[in-house]
């Protein structure tokens, strides 16, 4: 009799143990968090708050919690994607190319701009009262770039200056501001003479810097830069990658999401990646003597 009781208790404990383990595994699955990375286009805390509706939308579509992450600089997102601490990034093309080159990150989608086509341009902006009318006039001036890994904030506009015969280390003095909004502020405050940024920066930050709509003008435009890319860490689950792709491809069917992407990133939708377009990014980096394997 005693043996039967003991065996019965053992069975109960085994069942309870299996049940508890099952619950723990279920809870673990429910608590899985996917990190979505962004470069610091603006104040990091504010950006994370602004993109929360995007994270919520993707959470619903993918069936897993998605949280936004903004690094303090551009390379921080690239490194996060490489290590797997960031599962995917919605990042500029040069950052995407770096991630592919350095950690075999997977290009999933590219963005469509307001024209419905992929791509955008970098611009050099000056104040209207600066007297700077040509690229040659930039010699001897103060220039604000955004980040060494920024496509529109350094690589492409820097290449424009180099092609115009300007030695960046000898003919100008320059700094990296850390953000497009910060560069704009430097220009408006007359702390620099020229800034490198993206087309439409004055409209994007008009709320914070209304003078940008009246006091600055474009000096020069770059060749077309491939669109912002959705890039997944090689460590991200393949099924989740497919769910992410489908959710973003369906985004333009959701008016609120489309409006938010357009307002924040000038993105009207996503499409499959044409990898050949990104070869141009590498070519432009070579003009700047940038070794993709050594960028840190």
What are these regions (language model features)?
Residues 17-20:
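C-terminal motif of bacterial Sec signal peptides marking the signal peptidase cleavage site
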Residues 31-53, 225, 231-296:
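An extracytoplasmic/periplasmic, membrane-proximal ligand-sensing/linker region
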Residues 75-89, 102, 136-137, 180-200:
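Short helices/loops that flank or line small-molecule/ion binding pockets
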Residues 79-137:
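Acidic, polar ligand-binding/catalytic clefts
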Residues 130, 141-239, 246:
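Pocket-lining segment of extracytoplasmic ligand-binding domains
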Residues 1-9:
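Bacterial N-terminal signal peptides that target proteins for export
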Residues 27-97:
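Extracytoplasmic small-molecule ligand-binding "clamshell" domains
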Residues 60-70, 85, 162-177, 213-215, ...:
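A local structural motif
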């Amino acid at each position: 009799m005693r043996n039967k009781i003991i065996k019965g208790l053992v069975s109960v404990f085994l069942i309870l143990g299996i049940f508890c383990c099952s619950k723990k595994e279920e809870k673990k699955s429910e608590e899985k968090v996917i990190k979505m990375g962004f470069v610091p286009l603006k104040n990091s805390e504010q950006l994370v708050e602004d993109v929360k509706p995007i994270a919520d939308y993707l959470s619903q579509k993918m069936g897993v919690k998605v949280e936004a992450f903004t690094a303090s600089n551009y390379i921080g997102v690239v490194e996060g994607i490489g290590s797997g601490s960031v599962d995917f990034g919605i990042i500029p093309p040069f950052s995407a190319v770096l991630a592919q080159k350095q950690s075999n990150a997977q290009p999933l989608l590219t963005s469509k701009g307001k024209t419905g086509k992929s791509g955008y341009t970098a611009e050099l902006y000056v104040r209207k009262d600066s007297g700077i009318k040509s690229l040659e006039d930039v010699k001897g001036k103060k220039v604000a770039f955004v980040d060494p890994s920024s496509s529109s904030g350094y690589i492409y506009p820097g290449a424009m200056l180099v092609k115009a015969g300007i030695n960046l280390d000898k003919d100008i003095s320059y700094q990296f501001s850390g953000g497009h909004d910060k560069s704009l502020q430097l220009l408006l405050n007359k702390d620099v003479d020229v800034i490198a940024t993206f087309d439409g920066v004055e409209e994007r930050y008009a709320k914070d810097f209304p003078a940008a709509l009246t006091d600055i003008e474009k000096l020069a435009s770059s060749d077309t830069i491939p669109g912002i890319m959705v890039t997944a860490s090689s460590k991200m689950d393949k099924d989740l990658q497919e769910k992410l792709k489908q959710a973003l491809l369906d985004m333009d069917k959701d008016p609120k999401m489309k409006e938010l992407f357009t307002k924040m990133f000038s993105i009207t939708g996503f499409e499959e990646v044409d990898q050949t377009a990104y070869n141009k990014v590498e070519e432009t980096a070579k003009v700047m003597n940038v070794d993709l394997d050594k960028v840190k």
